[in-house]
């Protein structure tokens, strides 16, 4: 069975050296596809020959792409990376927390550390920033695609059987097309909308981050113009004809092109999950320029695409009632804490379950040694149940040794996370007790 999961957490500083042995992401996510590459094509020279005669390492412009299904708990991290403004409001009691994101004028966007597993090893990425984000839905799942640029990476081998995933502490239902509703110009659009697409780009200026003395980016890439394009697909019929003509001619009710006007409308996308109504998402584009495209072939239904380009001249109202001028605003209600860098070293409990075949092994010593500090160890002996409980273990990566006379010593690695830590170990009997 493959292990292909993506982990993400905000950095305190761009591209800071990250001790991944002591690092735990905010969550792990099973993604549909992932591709991280260094973009380090070599510099080649022919020196007048028909063949290459010299080659040297070229510049590194690392890029990545992650694609998957959207769920309410995790999608906030992607909006945190794409948009420059963020506000968190804690819920009262057991109520939902509110995360608000909107586009402003700040060119310095958040950066992240990330991990991506590839069955037998994982890439450890620093200085990761979202250059582009896409959401798309038609008649299946609401999907996302995120394009990243990053500073550099490292790799380490992993034990896929004992890889410790950070599990969500709340429902993470993947969103479907029937969870999504759209309002155009503050009302339900006429007719049936068969698909919606959002595409946003930050146009991060990577070229200016690479200079003398280093192959890879040396400073954070600043965002340039934010481009946001939207599209709704519908069909031309009696219900949608008026909307299509309004968009084409630039005025509501017009039957010929406007002399000077272009139609500006808000578009709002809301997500309400049938099985989980407390968790919600609203995406508002306060003011958009609207354009339509349509044609026909033979007797086929006339498909119409309503294209919208966002303007930074509309207003959105925050939860506290204040207003902001923006081209895009997102509100998410879930149980996730504020999206921010880690500031405190947490501890957790590790429960080791030691067996040999169907036998529970009593009296086995389970020892955890800090991966970066061999002097820091934590150990416990298994009870008659074969279970050893080790408390107050700081989060991070550890070397694992499990030993008992009459069995071969088990060695491996394990990452302690802020959550459930179940370590399953299978010992093999050995007459020599090795």
Walk through the language-model features, giving the residues of each.
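Structured interaction patches on ligand/partner-binding surfaces of diverse proteins
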Residues: 405-431
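Signature of extracytoplasmic/envelope-associated structural regions
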Residues: 1-349, 353-358, 366-368, 380-382, ...
């Amino acid at each position: 069975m493959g292990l292909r999961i993506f982990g993400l957490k905000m950095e305190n500083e761009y591209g800071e050296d990250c001790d991944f042995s002591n690092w735990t992401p905010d969550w792990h996510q099973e993604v549909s596809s992932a591709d991280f590459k260094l973009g380090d094509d070599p510099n080649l020279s022919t020196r007048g020959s028909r063949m290459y005669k010299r080659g040297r390492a070229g510049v590194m412009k690392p890029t990545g792409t992650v694609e998957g299904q959207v769920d309410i708990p995790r999608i906030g991290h992607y909006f945190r990376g794409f948009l420059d403004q963020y506000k968190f409001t804690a819920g009262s009691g057991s109520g939902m927390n509110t995360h608000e994101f909107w586009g402003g004028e700040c060119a310095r966007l958040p950066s992240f550390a990330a991990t991506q597993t590839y069955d037998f090893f994982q890439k450890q990425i620093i200085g990761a920033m979202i250059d582009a984000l896409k959401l798309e839905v038609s008649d299946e799942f609401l999907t996302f695609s995120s394009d990243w640029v990053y500073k550099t990476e490292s790799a380490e081998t992993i034990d896929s059987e004992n890889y410790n995933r950070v599990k969500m502490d709340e429902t993470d239902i993947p969103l479907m097309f029937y969870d999504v509703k759209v309002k155009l110009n503050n009302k339900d659009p006429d007719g049936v909308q068969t698909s919606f697409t959002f595409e946003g780009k930050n146009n991060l200026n990577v070229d200016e981050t690479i200079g003398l003395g280093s192959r890879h980016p040396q400073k954070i890439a600043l965002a340039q113009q934010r481009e946001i394009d939207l599209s709704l697909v519908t069909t031309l019929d009696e219900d949608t004809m008026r909307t299509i003509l309004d968009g084409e001619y630039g005025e509501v009710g017009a039957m010929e092109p406007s002399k000077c006007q272009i139609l500006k409308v808000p578009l709002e996308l809301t997500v309400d999950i049938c099985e989980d109504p407390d968790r919600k998402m609203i995406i508002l584009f306060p003011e958009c320029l609207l354009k339509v495209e349509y044609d026909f072939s033979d007797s086929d239904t006339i498909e119409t695409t309503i294209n919208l380009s966002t303007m930074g001249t509309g207003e959105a109202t925050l939860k506290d009632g204040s207003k902001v001028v923006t081209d895009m605003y997102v509100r998410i209600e879930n149980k996730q804490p504020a999206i921010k860098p880690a500031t405190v070293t947490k501890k957790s409990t590790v429960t080791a379950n030691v067996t040999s075949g169907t036998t529970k092994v009593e009296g086995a010593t389970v020892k955890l040694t800090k991966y970066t500090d061999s002097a820091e160890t934590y150990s416990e002996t298994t009870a008659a149940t074969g279970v050893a409980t080790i408390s107050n273990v700081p989060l991070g990566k550890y070397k694992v040794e499990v030993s008992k006379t009459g069995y071969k010593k088990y060695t491996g690695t394990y990452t302690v996370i802020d959550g459930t830590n179940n370590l399953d170990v299978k010992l093999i009997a050995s007459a020599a007790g090795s």
